[in-house]
Amino acid sequence: MSDRMSLSLAQSDPDVAAAIDHEVLRQHEGLEMIASENFVSRAVLEAAGSVFTNKYAEGYPGRRYYGGCEFADVVENLARDRAKQLFGAEHANVQPHSGSQANAAAYMSIIQPGDTILGLDLAHGGHLTHGHKLNFSGKLYRVASYGVRKDTETIDYDELEAIAVREQPKMIIGGGSAYPRIFDFARMRQIADKVGAFLLVDMAHFAGLVAGGAHPSPVPHAHIVTTTTHKTLRGPRSGLILCRQEHAAAVDKSVFPGQQGGPLVHIMAAKAVAFREALQPDFSKYAQQIVDNARALAAALAGHGYRIISGGTDTHLMLIDVFAKGILGSEAEAALGKAGITVNKNAIPYDTNPPLKPSGIRIGTPALTTRGMKEAEMKQIAQWIVSALEHRNNESMLERIHGEVTEMANQFPLYGWLREDAEALAR
């Protein structure tokens, strides 16, 4: 083995090593409030960085196209079995590289190109893969969309049913990326059955809440359920498909060889670890605390005069109308970033502003909850958000808030064993 193979990252590539160290400090010293982000455990990090990254394993356990897959089979079977146990599903495919690829494979397992799909409009909280014209879903399928009412900013299921009757979709999609309320899965299944459609639920954002019992499960109602494995589930960035046994063969063929070649065995190992963590009793407390924190934060921001889309949240996320205060979402994102609070700009329902300068911001609580923060911290964070937005053009004020944010972050330490090298670099 060459000497280069035994070099540390810092020795082999100091530029990448420095970027990682700086990212470690960024994550520790700030408040991560992007709703789709979280912090994985040390065990998940170790599995994701394991020697399984070297292994090719096309096919499925016991049916591989390569030799030497006996231990790859072990971790994939562990991941599949744990996913089924966690969500009460009959079948699980843990090979999708991402939520988008999970959706693509799931769609192609039950419908054909040119068929009609009915999903939540992206502008009302849906996702690109639910029918956006620039996405594969909008190019391969005929797209119909449902949205939220203008007065309540929640889904009108009578209107959804009327659209389904009119459009006759082959598949109805539940789930989204910026909808703060619980979907009525039972009603959606009734509508799907009425028009002869499949019901697919994309629970990427709230899968961890489902796993922890803090959110109703779509599994008993949907023909197929897809999800990412990060976000509230607190695993590696990847995908997962759950389905009834009758769809298992079609789903598996659609993933491999339909969408992908070899799976990422090191990521399947990390998924297995994350699923085991989510099966532990303390994960239920974690999931409920995410929701409690989100509600406390939304209430605190509302108390400061900010309009919360739909009036609140039932999940881990909320949308804030900052344009009502004369602030663009892009301006709010930038100001909060300078204050050490990471959020993302986001359109709100019936937004008249362009996508890159929308009227809202999206905020989530999974990552802060992972660090151990609770309702008291949410109230303080709300005050910082309000102050940063009010003083968005005052660099010294934003810097002062950032200092206070870092003081709080230090009370909830993150990745201490990694920070040793990062802090040495900073010195």
UniProtKB/Swiss-Prot annotation:
Which residues does UniProt assign to the signal peptide?
A: none
Q: What is its EC number?
A: 2.1.2.1
Q: Where in the cell is it found?
A: Cytoplasm
- Site (described: Plays an important role in substrate specificity): H230
- List, alphabetically, the Gene3D superfamilies matched: Aspartate Aminotransferase, domain 1, Type I PLP-dependent aspartate aminotransferase-like (Major domain)
Record's superkingdom?
Answer: Bacteria
The protein's matches in CDD domains, at most eight in alphabetical order, are given as: SHMT
What this protein catalyses is: (6R)-5,10-methylene-5,6,7,8-tetrahydrofolate + glycine + H2O = (6S)-5,6,7,8-tetrahydrofolate + L-serine
Question: InterPro entries in the record, alphabetically?
Answer: PyrdxlP-dep_Trfase, PyrdxlP-dep_Trfase_major, PyrdxlP-dep_Trfase_small, Ser_HO-MeTrfase, Ser_HO-MeTrfase-like, Ser_HO-MeTrfase_PLP_BS, SHMT-like_dom
According to the UniProt entry, its GO molecular function terms are:
glycine hydroxymethyltransferase activity; pyridoxal phosphate binding
Q: What's a GO biological-process term for it?
A: tetrahydrofolate interconversion
N6-(pyridoxal phosphate)lysine-modified residues are K231
Q: In which pathway does it act?
A: One-carbon metabolism; tetrahydrofolate interconversion; Amino-acid biosynthesis; glycine biosynthesis; glycine from L-serine: step 1/1
- Enumerate the residues binding (6S)-5,6,7,8-tetrahydrofolate: L122, G126, H127, L128
Q: Which UniProt keywords apply?
A: Amino-acid biosynthesis, Cytoplasm, One-carbon metabolism, Pyridoxal phosphate, Transferase
Tell me the subunit arrangement: Homodimer.
Q: Which PANTHER family match?
A: SERINE HYDROXYMETHYLTRANSFERASE, SERINE HYDROXYMETHYLTRANSFERASE 1
The UniProt function text for this chain reads:
Catalyzes the reversible interconversion of serine and glycine with tetrahydrofolate (THF) serving as the one-carbon carrier. This reaction serves as the major source of one-carbon groups required for the biosynthesis of purines, thymidylate, methionine, and other important biomolecules. Also exhibits THF-independent aldolase activity toward beta-hydroxyamino acids, producing glycine and aldehydes, via a retro-aldol mechanism.
State what protein this is by name.
Serine hydroxymethyltransferase
Q: Which organism is it from?
A: Acidobacterium capsulatum (strain ATCC 51196 / DSM 11244 / BCRC 80197 / JCM 7670 / NBRC 15755 / NCIMB 13165 / 161)
Gene expressing this chain: glyA
